[in-house]
From Swiss-Prot, chain A:
InterPro entries: ATP_synth_F1_dsu/esu (IPR001469), ATP_synth_F1_dsu/esu_N (IPR020546), ATPD_C_fung (IPR048938), ATPsynth_dsu/esu_N (IPR036771). One of its GO terms (molecular function) is proton-transporting ATP synthase activity, rotational mechanism. Mitochondrial membrane ATP synthase (F(1)F(0) ATP synthase or Complex V) produces ATP from ADP in the presence of a proton gradient across the membrane which is generated by electron transport complexes of the respiratory chain. F-type ATP synthases consist of two structural domains, F(1) - containing the extramembraneous catalytic core, and F(0) - containing the membrane proton channel, linked together by a central stalk and a peripheral stalk. It comes from Pichia angusta. The gene is ATP16. Belongs to the ATPase epsilon chain family. It is a peripheral membrane protein. Keywords: ATP synthesis, CF(1), Hydrogen ion transport, Ion transport, Membrane, Mitochondrion, Mitochondrion inner membrane, Transit peptide, Transport. Gene3D superfamilies: 6.10.140.880, F0F1 ATP synthase delta/epsilon subunit, N-terminal. It comes from the Eukaryota. GO terms for cellular component: mitochondrial inner membrane; proton-transporting ATP synthase complex. This is ATP synthase subunit delta, mitochondrial. It is found in: Mitochondrion inner membrane. Residues 1-22 form a transit peptide. F-type ATP synthases have 2 components, the catalytic core F(1) and the membrane-embedded component F(0), linked together by a central stalk and a peripheral stalk. The central stalk, also called rotor shaft, is often seen as part of F(1). The peripheral stalk is seen as part of F(0). F(0) contains the membrane channel next to the rotor. F-type ATP synthases form dimers but each monomer functions independently in ATP generation.
Swiss-Prot record, chain B:
Keywords: ATP synthesis, CF(1), Hydrogen ion transport, Ion transport, Membrane, Mitochondrion, Mitochondrion inner membrane, Transport. InterPro entries: ATP_synth_F1_ATPase_gsu (IPR035968), ATP_synth_F1_gsu (IPR000131), ATP_synth_F1_gsu_CS (IPR023632). NCBIfam families: ATPsyn_F1gamma. GO terms for cellular component: mitochondrial inner membrane; proton-transporting ATP synthase complex. The lineage of its organism: Eukaryota, Fungi, Dikarya, Ascomycota, Saccharomycotina. It is a peripheral membrane protein. This is ATP synthase subunit gamma, mitochondrial. Belongs to the ATPase gamma chain family. The keyword Iron-sulfur does not apply. It is found in: Mitochondrion inner membrane. One of its GO terms (molecular function) is proton-transporting ATP synthase activity, rotational mechanism.
Length: 160, 269
């Protein structure tokens, strides 16, 4: 008898706990961003107000409650604007941004570095070399150079 | 055994102890870096595993072509790391006898060739000396992609559980078709012209390989540290045993000589 009533209490308890879901536990009005490269996680679930992304279909700004989607990123600048208004800029070499339900944005990219870590002279000399290689007879070298030019030109535009 | 024999034995055990101890120290110093690499690759993988979890992507139950990628490394002396992966891969092959196998690392290659030589289609070596990089993982993924399309790809690796434990686990890698067929994909607004499923499937394979290699590396280093720690302890025990035996034998030899001398001297009286 006692055991039976215990069991029924246990059942009702689990019932009420089961209603509480993960999506309710987080505040959906704050955008949470993770910016990760394979060798380093720059942000993990950091609460920010806006993120600007260099999507391959064009620049896009992401705010909280954005519709879930997946975007391929072109080489360009990811701008993270914190709720205090300070913005930090990172250059990424392309990758993916997935916006998940619950205002969660995760950006995975192969390389990501702060914009002020780049030297404009280095970019110029590397770009000159890549442009020289782009007209190479070897198809692989030419294709690699074309990618290099795409990244370096985006980087040059971002640094200036 | 004679005194000389025990002496050489004792010396060689002492040398072995020095070697295992050094290997243990080397493994300990690498441990920190291996764990950092593993943590960042885990975080990197979360990006797309979150997406797959939300879209509820799953591998097809009945796959015509299955590929198993077994990730381990080239170096031994690290406990049961390689044989555990081989065992797990063999168990998978029991379920799907026609699956193709790609091996990463010489040790797992040797083990798979012994029992399932006809299934192994491609193997890599020279990885796992240092913490894996994205560059290595993408080169491997590129080669694997040249094998053709598979309905189901599974990456077998040693999951790093703690400093003393690891367990063979599986990362699924999804084909573009299974991504498109995900039941909850409609929650996302994907642009049709960008071929997102194809690129996502490619990056998720690279990601799975990178994460598997990083976890495997960390597990291997910690397993090696433990194996070498045990070996050093055992060597220490043997050194103690043999030192006692050596001293006893030396005593016995001296006593024997004394007995000889004294009996000789007393016989002269």
């Amino acid at each position: 008898m006692f055991r039976q009533s215990l069991r029924s209490i246990a059942r009702t308890r689990t019932g009420t706990i089961g209603v509480r879901t993960y999506a309710e536990a987080v505040n959906p009005d704050v955008l949470k961003v993770s910016l990760v490269a394979p060798h380093q996680a720059i942000f993990t679930n950091k609460e920010v107000s806006q993120v600007n992304l260099p999507a391959s279909s064009g620049e896009m700004g992401v705010l909280a409650n954005h519709v879930p989607t997946v975007e391929e990123l072109a080489p360009g600048v990811v701008e993270v604007i914190e709720s205090s208004g300070t913005a930090s800029k990172y250059f990424v070499s392309g990758g993916f941004a997935s916006i998940l339900p619950g205002s969660k944005l995760s950006i995975s990219t192969v390389e990501a570095h702060p914009l002020d870590a780049f030297s404009s002279e280095n970019i110029k000399s590397l770009l000159a070399e890549a442009q020289k290689n782009a007209s190479s007879a070897d198809e692989t070298v030419a294709a690699e150079a074309a990618i290099e030019i795409e990244v370096l030109e985006a980087l040059q535009a971002a640094v200036h | 055994a004679t005194l000389r024999e025990i002496e050489t034995r004792l010396k060689s055990i002492k040398n072995i102890e020095k070697i295992t101890n050094t290997m243990k120290v080397v493994a300990s110093t690498r441990m920190g870096r291996a764990q950092r690499a593993m943590a960042s690759s885990r975080a990197f993988r979360e990006g797309d595993s979150d997406f797959f979890a939300t879209a509820e992507t799953s591998t097809p139950e009945t796959a015509e072509k299955t590929l198993i990628i077994a990730v381990s490394s080239d170096k031994g002396l690290c406990g049961s790391i390689h044989s555990q992966i081989a065992k797990a891969t063999r168990a998978k092959l029991q379920e799907t006898p026609n699956a193709d196998v790609v091996t990463i690392g010489d040790k797992i290659k040797a083990q798979m060739l012994r029992t399932h030589s006809s299934n192994v289609v491609l193997s890599f070596n020279g990885v796992g000396k240092e913490a894996p990089t994205f560059w290595e993982a993408s080169l491997i993924a590129d080669e694997i992609r040249k094998l053709g399309d598979y309905d189901k790809i599974e990456v077998m690796y040693n999951k790093f559980v703690s400093g003393v434990a690891f367990e063979p686990s599986v990362f699924p890698s999804f084909s573009p078709i299974s991504i498109e067929e995900s039941p909850k994909l409609s929650e996302f607004e994907l642009e049709e012209d960008q071929a997102i499923p194809t690129s996502l499937s490619q990056i998720s394979l690279t990601n799975a390989i990178l994460n598997a290699m990083a976890e495997g590396y960390a597990s291997e280093i910690s397993a090696r540290r433990n194996a070498m720690d045990n070996a050093s302890k055992n060597a220490g025990e043997m050194i103690n045993k043999y030192s006692i035996l050596y001293n006893r034998t030396r005593q016995a030899v001296i006593t024997n000589e004394l007995v000889d001398i004294i009996t000789g001297a007393s016989s002269l009286d």
